[in-house]
Amino acid sequence: MGGGERYNIPDPQSRNASKNQQQHNRQKTKDQNSQMKIVHKKKERGHGYNPSAVQNGGKTKSLSNNSNWNASLSSPSLLFKSQASQNYAGAKFSEPPSPSVLPKPPSHWVHVSLNPSDKETMTFQLKTLLKVQV
């Protein structure tokens, strides 16, 4: 109850002035951001300022490049020919791995004295469990 709290009561005119200033600053920031976005988009598209294009009356020399590009696209098999000739060294997932590659189970997991019929049953059960539904 001792020290009373002090409240700063702002002058209503200065409050309105600061609001107007804030709005003005926000508008400036928005304008600057929109200009930056436009410049950035132009750079992404590759339409930056080109003085030679202005001198040529807006005509660019990209027409000769486009004809080369279209010629290479007319035969897409040429694009993928080098990739198709390369062999993939990894495992093919459509084929099951060979048993020699698979790790051996610990000796305490499998009872050593199994009958051949029990082995066949276990093999069949394991294969049905490991089958991948396509």
Curated annotation (Swiss-Prot):
A motif (SH3-binding) lies at residues 94-100. Residues 62-74 have a biased composition (Low complexity). GO terms for biological process: nuclear-transcribed mRNA catabolic process, nonsense-mediated decay. It is found in: Nucleus; Cytoplasm, P-body. The keyword Methyltransferase does not apply. Residues 11-24, 52-61 have a biased composition (Polar residues). Keywords: Activator, Cytoplasm, Nonsense-mediated mRNA decay, Nucleus, Transcription, Transcription regulation. It comes from the Eukaryota. Residues 1-74 are annotated as: Disordered. One of its GO terms (cellular component) is nucleoplasm. Belongs to the PNRC family. PNRC2 subfamily. Involved in nonsense-mediated mRNA decay (NMD) by acting as a bridge between the mRNA decapping complex and the NMD machinery. May act by targeting the NMD machinery to the P-body and recruiting the decapping machinery to aberrant mRNAs. Required for UPF1/RENT1 localization to the P-body. Plays a role in glucocorticoid receptor-mediated mRNA degradation by interacting with the glucocorticoid receptor NR3C1 in a ligand-dependent manner when it is bound to the 5' UTR of target mRNAs and recruiting the RNA helicase UPF1 and the mRNA-decapping enzyme DCP1A, leading to RNA decay. The interaction between PNRC2 and nuclear receptors is dependent on the SH3 binding motif. Interacts with UPF1/RENT1; preferentially interacts with hyperphosphorylated form. Interacts with DCP1A. Interacts with many nuclear receptors including ESR1, ESRRA, ESRRG, NR3C1/GR, NR5A1, PGR, TR, RAR and RXR. This is Proline-rich nuclear receptor coactivator 2.
